[in-house]
Amino acid sequence: MDKRWSLQGMTALVTGAASGIGYAIVEELASFGAIIHICDISETLLSQSLSEWEKKGFQVSGSICDVASRPDREKLMQTVSSLFDGKLNILVNNVGVIRGKPTTEYVAEDFSYHISTNLEPAFHFSQLSHLLLKASGFGSIVFMSSATGVVSVQCGSIYSLTKGALNQLTRNLACEWAKDGIRANAVAPNVVKTPLSQSYLEDVGFKEALFSRTPLGRAGEPNEVASLVVFLCLPAASYITGQTICIDGGFTVNAFSYKPQA
């Protein structure tokens, strides 16, 4: 295989990876030959996922981690450093949460909940992994952003601002750490079929509104997002950095639909 299209022997950390998009990212990374460590807050899901990957012959290990806990994050990175001999090729800041409400209904706890899960861990994990990524000689960070961090949507302003902040962090790190051989990019999906989005997609009004604004007329699949994430980590993508790439069925470029009368 052309080495540009291989991750053979490269190491990766994926956060929140025992289900949903994170799970799909691990499967894709492993299929390209990466050696992966994941974290998740659910011991049950983690054990189940690790067992499934072992049966497939994937090289995946895992740790229980509450990413909202600074000590947990530091402990996780110590584990990763030990496992991978002080080097890391890929960091995927995937974990995220959402509480969809009108802005006037949010309370202080909602704000801290989103910041402490969606934004602070991604920033801190990037800090903690800097020396490991630099030591690898070929480092790549991918942030899981959202289409809502690119365009405005109703009932999710705090979630959206955390994703918009990740897009800016992507640009900052891409420029600041390029000299260290580290690239940084963000992936911004539309709604994707995962446990996190299930309740939204079961809402007929939400689903109709979303699909009418999405040219491809459907939600995304986890493996579709995973394909883009893994591409950005490949040597083939070595000149791509600082970008927020929407994977959204056309949602963010769609203005309005109008059919003139015949």
Swiss-Prot record:
Keywords linked to the UniProt accession: NADP, Oxidoreductase
One Pfam assignment: adh_short_C2
One GO CC term, this protein: peroxisome
Tagged with keyword NADP: yes
Active-site residues, Swiss-Prot/TrEMBL: 159
Membrane-traversing stretches: none
InterPro entries, per database record: NAD(P)-bd_dom_sf (IPR036291), SDR_fam (IPR002347), TR (IPR045000)
Residues that hold NADP(+) according to the record: 13-37
Annotated positions binding substrate: 146
Molecular functions (GO terms): oxidoreductase activity
Enzyme Commission code(s) on record: 1.1.1.-
Family the entry assigns: Belongs to the short-chain dehydrogenases/reductases (SDR) family. SDR65C subfamily.
UniProt protein name: Tropinone reductase homolog At2g29310
Organism, scientific name: Arabidopsis thaliana
